[in-house]
Amino acid sequence: MTKENATSIHIKDFQGVKIHSFVAPYEYAANATHIIETANELVIVDGQFITPLALAFRGYVDSLNKPINRVFISHGHPDHYFGYASAFADQKGYSLEAVNKIIAEWGPQMITNQKPTFGDMIPDQVLVPQHTVKAGTSEKIDGLNYEFESVEGAENEVQLLIKLPEIGVVIAQDLVYSGVHLWLGMGWFDNWMKELQKISDLEGYNYILPGHGLPCVKDEVVNNIRYLMTAKAIHRKGLSAEDFKKELLAAYPHRESVMMFDLYLGFLFGQMGSH
Protein backbone atom coordinates (compact mmCIF):
# COMPACT_ATOMS: atom_id res chain seq x y z
CA MET A 1 0.00 0.00 0.00
CA THR A 2 1.41 3.34 -0.97
CA LYS A 3 1.06 6.88 0.27
CA GLU A 4 -1.29 7.38 -2.69
CA ASN A 5 -3.83 5.41 -0.63
CA ALA A 6 -4.22 2.54 -3.08
CA THR A 7 -5.54 -0.95 -2.61
CA SER A 8 -2.62 -3.33 -2.07
CA ILE A 9 -2.08 -7.01 -2.82
CA HIS A 10 0.75 -8.71 -0.98
CA ILE A 11 1.82 -12.31 -1.73
CA LYS A 12 4.04 -14.52 0.42
CA ASP A 13 5.13 -17.97 -0.75
CA PHE A 14 5.83 -20.58 1.93
CA GLN A 15 7.34 -23.32 -0.23
CA GLY A 16 4.16 -23.94 -2.15
CA VAL A 17 1.57 -22.49 0.23
CA LYS A 18 0.86 -18.96 -0.90
CA ILE A 19 -0.80 -16.33 1.24
CA HIS A 20 -2.38 -13.43 -0.60
CA SER A 21 -3.38 -10.34 1.41
CA PHE A 22 -5.81 -7.86 -0.15
CA VAL A 23 -5.65 -4.60 1.77
CA ALA A 24 -8.11 -1.73 1.32
CA PRO A 25 -7.03 1.91 1.01
CA TYR A 26 -6.28 3.81 4.21
CA GLU A 27 -9.51 5.80 3.84
CA TYR A 28 -11.33 2.49 4.33
CA ALA A 29 -9.26 1.60 7.38
CA ALA A 30 -6.84 -0.61 5.43
CA ASN A 31 -9.20 -3.57 5.87
CA ALA A 32 -7.16 -6.74 5.33
CA THR A 33 -8.65 -9.89 3.84
CA HIS A 34 -6.59 -12.94 3.00
CA ILE A 35 -6.39 -16.01 0.79
CA ILE A 36 -4.57 -19.18 1.79
CA GLU A 37 -3.73 -20.89 -1.50
CA THR A 38 -2.73 -24.54 -1.37
CA ALA A 39 -2.20 -26.98 -4.23
CA ASN A 40 -5.85 -27.48 -5.11
CA GLU A 41 -8.01 -25.06 -3.14
CA LEU A 42 -8.40 -21.61 -1.62
CA VAL A 43 -9.43 -20.62 1.88
CA ILE A 44 -10.68 -17.06 2.37
CA VAL A 45 -10.43 -15.00 5.55
CA ASP A 46 -12.98 -12.18 5.91
CA GLY A 47 -14.72 -10.20 3.22
CA GLN A 48 -14.03 -6.42 3.19
CA PHE A 49 -16.51 -3.70 4.17
CA ILE A 50 -17.86 -1.87 1.13
CA THR A 51 -19.25 -3.83 -1.79
CA PRO A 52 -16.89 -2.43 -4.47
CA LEU A 53 -13.86 -3.60 -2.49
CA ALA A 54 -15.50 -6.94 -1.69
CA LEU A 55 -16.20 -7.51 -5.38
CA ALA A 56 -12.66 -6.50 -6.29
CA PHE A 57 -11.38 -9.00 -3.74
CA ARG A 58 -13.64 -11.70 -5.19
CA GLY A 59 -12.37 -10.87 -8.65
CA TYR A 60 -8.82 -11.39 -7.49
CA VAL A 61 -9.79 -14.66 -5.79
CA ASP A 62 -11.42 -15.92 -8.98
CA SER A 63 -8.33 -14.97 -11.00
CA LEU A 64 -6.41 -17.68 -9.15
CA ASN A 65 -8.56 -20.30 -10.91
CA LYS A 66 -8.96 -22.63 -7.95
CA PRO A 67 -12.12 -23.60 -6.08
CA ILE A 68 -12.91 -21.95 -2.75
CA ASN A 69 -13.10 -24.45 0.09
CA ARG A 70 -14.66 -22.00 2.55
CA VAL A 71 -14.75 -18.47 3.93
CA PHE A 72 -13.73 -17.86 7.54
CA ILE A 73 -15.27 -14.83 9.25
CA SER A 74 -13.06 -13.75 12.12
CA HIS A 75 -15.47 -11.71 14.24
CA GLY A 76 -18.68 -9.75 14.41
CA HIS A 77 -17.65 -6.32 13.14
CA PRO A 78 -19.30 -5.35 9.85
CA ASP A 79 -16.07 -4.36 8.11
CA HIS A 80 -15.23 -8.07 8.16
CA TYR A 81 -18.57 -9.72 7.36
CA PHE A 82 -20.45 -7.30 5.07
CA GLY A 83 -18.31 -8.44 2.15
CA TYR A 84 -19.27 -12.06 2.74
CA ALA A 85 -22.84 -11.18 1.75
CA SER A 86 -21.73 -8.88 -1.06
CA ALA A 87 -19.24 -11.11 -2.81
CA PHE A 88 -19.09 -14.62 -1.35
CA ALA A 89 -22.74 -15.53 -0.77
CA ASP A 90 -22.27 -18.62 -2.93
CA GLN A 91 -19.58 -19.99 -0.61
CA LYS A 92 -19.68 -21.85 2.69
CA GLY A 93 -18.99 -19.63 5.69
CA TYR A 94 -17.39 -20.71 8.96
CA SER A 95 -16.78 -19.07 12.32
CA LEU A 96 -17.12 -19.64 16.03
CA GLU A 97 -20.68 -20.18 17.20
CA ALA A 98 -20.47 -17.04 19.34
CA VAL A 99 -19.39 -14.96 16.34
CA ASN A 100 -22.24 -16.31 14.24
CA LYS A 101 -24.69 -15.33 16.98
CA ILE A 102 -23.32 -11.78 17.12
CA ILE A 103 -23.65 -11.39 13.35
CA ALA A 104 -27.21 -12.75 13.42
CA GLU A 105 -28.22 -10.50 16.32
CA TRP A 106 -26.46 -7.27 15.42
CA GLY A 107 -25.95 -7.51 11.67
CA PRO A 108 -29.38 -6.18 10.59
CA GLN A 109 -28.96 -3.17 12.86
CA MET A 110 -25.51 -2.53 11.40
CA ILE A 111 -27.07 -2.45 7.93
CA THR A 112 -29.70 0.01 9.15
CA ASN A 113 -27.09 2.21 10.81
CA GLN A 114 -24.72 2.30 7.82
CA LYS A 115 -27.20 2.57 4.93
CA PRO A 116 -27.71 6.36 5.24
CA THR A 117 -23.96 6.87 4.80
CA PHE A 118 -23.01 4.12 2.37
CA GLY A 119 -26.22 3.32 0.47
CA ASP A 120 -25.61 0.71 -2.22
CA MET A 121 -21.95 0.44 -1.21
CA ILE A 122 -22.98 -2.04 1.50
CA PRO A 123 -25.27 -5.08 1.22
CA ASP A 124 -28.99 -4.92 1.92
CA GLN A 125 -28.80 -7.83 4.33
CA VAL A 126 -26.18 -9.77 6.23
CA LEU A 127 -25.21 -13.35 5.63
CA VAL A 128 -24.46 -15.39 8.74
CA PRO A 129 -21.88 -18.17 8.33
CA GLN A 130 -23.72 -21.48 8.13
CA HIS A 131 -21.02 -23.57 9.80
CA THR A 132 -19.10 -23.47 13.05
CA VAL A 133 -15.61 -24.31 14.16
CA LYS A 134 -14.75 -25.12 17.76
CA ALA A 135 -11.93 -23.55 19.69
CA GLY A 136 -9.23 -26.02 20.61
CA THR A 137 -9.73 -28.13 17.51
CA SER A 138 -7.81 -28.43 14.27
CA GLU A 139 -8.59 -29.43 10.72
CA LYS A 140 -6.53 -30.33 7.68
CA ILE A 141 -7.68 -28.53 4.54
CA ASP A 142 -5.98 -29.54 1.29
CA GLY A 143 -3.00 -30.86 3.24
CA LEU A 144 -2.51 -27.82 5.50
CA ASN A 145 -3.30 -27.89 9.22
CA TYR A 146 -5.51 -25.13 10.66
CA GLU A 147 -5.68 -24.73 14.45
CA PHE A 148 -8.65 -22.81 15.84
CA GLU A 149 -8.73 -20.66 18.96
CA SER A 150 -11.20 -18.26 20.54
CA VAL A 151 -10.06 -14.91 21.92
CA GLU A 152 -12.49 -13.09 24.19
CA GLY A 153 -12.55 -9.54 25.51
CA ALA A 154 -9.77 -7.99 23.44
CA GLU A 155 -10.50 -5.79 20.40
CA ASN A 156 -14.02 -7.19 20.35
CA GLU A 157 -16.20 -9.57 22.34
CA VAL A 158 -15.02 -12.79 20.72
CA GLN A 159 -12.81 -13.59 17.77
CA LEU A 160 -11.60 -16.59 15.83
CA LEU A 161 -7.81 -16.85 15.78
CA ILE A 162 -6.25 -19.37 13.39
CA LYS A 163 -2.74 -20.78 13.47
CA LEU A 164 -1.02 -22.47 10.56
CA PRO A 165 1.76 -24.31 12.42
CA GLU A 166 3.45 -25.89 9.41
CA ILE A 167 4.28 -22.49 7.94
CA GLY A 168 4.49 -20.40 11.13
CA VAL A 169 1.54 -18.11 10.39
CA VAL A 170 -0.95 -16.57 12.81
CA ILE A 171 -4.19 -15.28 11.31
CA ALA A 172 -4.74 -12.65 14.01
CA GLN A 173 -7.11 -10.32 12.17
CA ASP A 174 -8.27 -7.51 14.49
CA LEU A 175 -6.02 -8.49 17.34
CA VAL A 176 -3.27 -6.82 15.31
CA TYR A 177 -3.34 -3.52 13.40
CA SER A 178 -0.34 -3.12 11.12
CA GLY A 179 0.81 0.45 10.52
CA VAL A 180 -2.60 1.98 11.19
CA HIS A 181 -4.40 3.30 14.25
CA LEU A 182 -6.16 0.72 16.40
CA TRP A 183 -9.93 0.57 16.91
CA LEU A 184 -10.32 1.01 20.68
CA GLY A 185 -14.09 1.10 21.04
CA MET A 186 -14.39 -1.50 23.80
CA GLY A 187 -11.62 -0.08 25.97
CA TRP A 188 -10.40 -3.52 27.02
CA PHE A 189 -6.76 -2.46 27.01
CA ASP A 190 -5.37 -4.91 29.56
CA ASN A 191 -6.79 -8.13 28.18
CA TRP A 192 -5.99 -7.13 24.63
CA MET A 193 -2.36 -6.58 25.64
CA LYS A 194 -2.31 -10.01 27.31
CA GLU A 195 -3.58 -11.66 24.14
CA LEU A 196 -1.00 -9.84 22.04
CA GLN A 197 1.73 -10.94 24.41
CA LYS A 198 0.64 -14.54 23.86
CA ILE A 199 1.14 -14.07 20.13
CA SER A 200 4.49 -12.42 20.69
CA ASP A 201 5.60 -15.35 22.85
CA LEU A 202 4.66 -18.03 20.32
CA GLU A 203 7.65 -20.01 19.15
CA GLY A 204 7.94 -20.79 15.49
CA TYR A 205 5.45 -18.16 14.35
CA ASN A 206 6.59 -14.87 12.88
CA TYR A 207 4.24 -14.04 10.02
CA ILE A 208 1.12 -12.28 11.23
CA LEU A 209 -1.99 -11.60 9.20
CA PRO A 210 -3.66 -8.50 10.65
CA GLY A 211 -7.23 -7.33 10.24
CA HIS A 212 -6.03 -3.91 9.11
CA GLY A 213 -2.82 -3.11 7.27
CA LEU A 214 -0.13 -5.19 5.62
CA PRO A 215 1.11 -8.56 6.91
CA CYS A 216 3.74 -8.09 9.57
CA VAL A 217 6.15 -9.79 11.94
CA LYS A 218 6.18 -9.86 15.73
CA ASP A 219 7.80 -6.43 15.97
CA GLU A 220 4.45 -4.94 14.99
CA VAL A 221 2.71 -7.03 17.66
CA VAL A 222 5.01 -5.41 20.22
CA ASN A 223 4.23 -2.01 18.68
CA ASN A 224 0.53 -2.72 19.20
CA ILE A 225 1.14 -3.51 22.86
CA ARG A 226 2.97 -0.22 23.31
CA TYR A 227 0.20 1.64 21.50
CA LEU A 228 -2.38 0.13 23.85
CA MET A 229 -0.28 1.04 26.88
CA THR A 230 -0.11 4.64 25.67
CA ALA A 231 -3.83 4.76 24.87
CA LYS A 232 -4.70 3.35 28.29
CA ALA A 233 -2.58 5.95 30.06
CA ILE A 234 -4.15 8.80 28.07
CA HIS A 235 -7.66 7.44 28.62
CA ARG A 236 -7.07 7.33 32.38
CA LYS A 237 -6.55 11.10 32.40
CA GLY A 238 -10.27 11.63 32.01
CA LEU A 239 -9.91 13.82 28.93
CA SER A 240 -12.63 14.62 26.45
CA ALA A 241 -12.86 12.44 23.37
CA GLU A 242 -11.29 15.16 21.24
CA ASP A 243 -8.38 15.71 23.62
CA PHE A 244 -7.83 11.95 23.86
CA LYS A 245 -7.60 11.85 20.07
CA LYS A 246 -5.16 14.77 19.97
CA GLU A 247 -2.81 13.19 22.51
CA LEU A 248 -2.81 9.76 20.88
CA LEU A 249 -2.25 11.29 17.45
CA ALA A 250 0.65 13.29 18.84
CA ALA A 251 2.15 10.09 20.25
CA TYR A 252 1.70 8.20 16.95
CA PRO A 253 1.83 10.73 14.11
CA HIS A 254 3.01 8.24 11.51
CA ARG A 255 0.25 5.65 11.83
CA GLU A 256 -2.27 5.75 9.00
CA SER A 257 -6.10 5.68 8.90
CA VAL A 258 -6.73 8.59 11.25
CA MET A 259 -10.42 8.14 10.44
CA MET A 260 -10.32 5.14 12.81
CA PHE A 261 -10.86 7.57 15.70
CA ASP A 262 -14.18 8.68 14.25
CA LEU A 263 -15.28 5.05 14.14
CA TYR A 264 -14.66 4.29 17.80
CA LEU A 265 -14.63 7.40 19.98
CA GLY A 266 -18.40 7.28 20.42
CA PHE A 267 -18.10 3.73 21.77
CA LEU A 268 -15.08 4.34 23.98
CA PHE A 269 -16.61 7.43 25.55
CA GLY A 270 -20.02 5.88 26.14
CA GLN A 271 -21.98 7.78 23.51
CA MET A 272 -22.91 4.64 21.55
CA GLY A 273 -23.71 1.00 22.26
CA SER A 274 -21.35 -1.95 22.27
CA HIS A 275 -21.26 -2.59 18.49
Q: What are the residue ranges of the model-derived segments?
A:
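Accessory terminal helices/loops
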Residues: 2, 201-203, 214-275
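Divalent metal-coordination and catalytic microenvironments
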Residues: 36, 46, 61, 75, ...
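Active-site HxH/HxHxD metal-binding segment of metal-dependent hydrolases
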Residues: 55, 59-138
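Conserved beta-strand hairpin/beta-sheet module of binuclear metal-dependent hydrolase folds
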Residues: 9-59, 63, 160-174
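Short catalytic-loop micro-motif centered on adjacent basic/acidic residues
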Residues: 43-46, 69-72, 147-148
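Basic/polar N-terminal segments that are highly enriched at the extreme N-terminus
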Residues: 1-17, 273-275
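Metallo-beta-lactamase
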Residues: 42, 49-51, 145, 152-225, ...
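Short acidic-hydrophobic surface loop/beta-edge motif
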Residues: 12, 36, 136-142
